[in-house]
Amino acid sequence: MQTDQQNQTDVGGNLAGAQPASGGHATCTATPIASPTPSHTPSRTVKRNLRTRHVSMIALGGSIGTGLFIASGETIHSAGPGGALVAYAAIGIMVYFFMTSLGEIATYLPTTGSFATYASRFVDPALGFAMGWNYWFNWAITVAVDTTTSSIVLRYWFPQVPLWVFSLAVLALIFLINILAVRAFGETEYWLALVKVITVLIFLAIGLLTVIGIIGGKAPLLTNFTYRKAPFTGGFPAVLGAFAIAGFSFQGTELIGITAGESANPEKSIPKAIKQVFWRILLFYILSIFVIACLIPYTSPNLLGSNASDISISPFTLVFQRAGLAAAAGVMNAVVFTSVLSAANSGMYASTRMLYALAKEKQAPGIFGMVNFHGIPVPALLGTTFVAFMAFLSSIFGEEIYTFLVAASGLTGFIAWAGIAISHYRFRRAFLRQGHRLSELRYRAKLFPFGPLLALILCILVIIGQDLHSFAVWDWRAIGITYMSVPLFLILFLAYKFKNHTKLIPLDQVDLSRSPIEDQASDQAANRAEEESLSELKSRLAADRR
């Protein structure tokens, strides 16, 4: 009988048997997998216990949240219904190319460090270092923001309870979920995401029926698309601003790369999740924006006033109320709470795994690379929780510090997306340069090299367009707050580069080797697929005989 250790795979940044190579990137050496004996005890690692449905819902749930339920109204108000649709469609396409780029690498090299590890191996270790720490910091701060937001949402029902009580309770709950086996995290995230998906589906059904007049009175149809300056208002700057809001709404989809390191069958689950998630997200966002724009004119002040503290004027709430759902505010408040809880849960998972991967790459203290018997990186989880807790305290006792921390993490998601595009471009070129064939890749990104290059250009435009108004009036304080993530990222990159004397890795020296652990996971996935095909064939033959 196989032991628990035998059934698990090492999916850290530096995989089993990997030793640091000159230049800072890892070179994997063959380390046989054997049963534990007195002379050979495998080190504990995170475990591959996430199923395909978990991976799909984690990515889907990570991108359907308050950005859709609350902030979507702002894009319609500022750019008009047409501008909002263009922004979300363009960002959706950009995200699709990023996801296919990440998917190609993640199915070939499924590691917990994801894009940070890939940047270290395919581009420059300094890039991976900066991306990893930036991403960890972003999600640690986001956990603090989400716990604060959740307390505001909960006060809708319990106005007498102090905010800090709810915040600490939510932070403790998130910690408990993440300290259990990764399967518990996956199940929790699956059901939280399912609540959001069902809400959007109900909203679309009720909204479309209202648009054509079956419920809610007279049919508005497309009158709001020709109202005053609609469908486009504010010109190109307004549309570019809508790009920024839409971009923040889609952030979280890159979590699919981190889950690859703990997926039971990454070569099957990652491609399937990418296909499902892209179309669902794009349709959910585009149709939701369309319904809101049809039912609420872009001039409505309610579109600008929606926030977590006043869910009664969320675009979703207004549409439900127009259709005659009296309890709309309470229902949407519950949905927003699940969204915030889901975001905090995903954020804790992502930041913990990134810190663990950085330690495996020897880019963080080694203690953060330790895991318990269940494959949970407890030191990394404790460190992340501590940072989130301190950030939360700063929101109570030092508002300026809290504002600085939030601003410092503001553009990290976009920086990660840009890094994914660069890493994939380098990976594919190195793969072919070193004599490999595309047929060796179990999943290939679409429209290479056009796809990742277009996505990179769009991502840079979105970063630049975050706060054009402040450039117009030369508001240096606002510019500094908005773009603070960029210089901090550059400081991390340059500091590591100069200290370790790293260079851009030549294509013919890029490390494309797969450790025995990765090959074993690939073989197991292939065997499972073959067994499923044989089982299906036997069933068909049996049916034919009958």
Which positions does each model-derived feature cover?
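Extracellular loop-to-transmembrane helix junctions
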Residues: 46-47, 57, 68-166, 481-485
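TM-loop-TM module centered on a large, flexible mid-protein loop between adjacent transmembrane helices
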Residues: 117, 124, 156, 242, ...
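Helix-loop-helix junctions that connect adjacent transmembrane segments
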Residues: 45-46, 85, 158-162, 194-329
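Membrane-helix boundary/coupling elements in multi-pass transport proteins
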Residues: 111, 134-148, 245-263, 326-366, ...
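Membrane-interface loop-to-helix entry segments
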Residues: 164-222, 251, 274-278, 282, ...
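Membrane-interface "cap" regions at the ends of multi-pass membrane proteins
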Residues: 1-73, 77-82, 96, 100, ...
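C-terminal membrane-solvent junction of multi-pass transporters and transport-like membrane proteins
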Residues: 192, 368-378, 417-481, 503, ...
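Helix-loop-helix connectors at the membrane interface of multi-pass transporters/channels
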Residues: 116-121, 147-167, 199, 257-268, ...
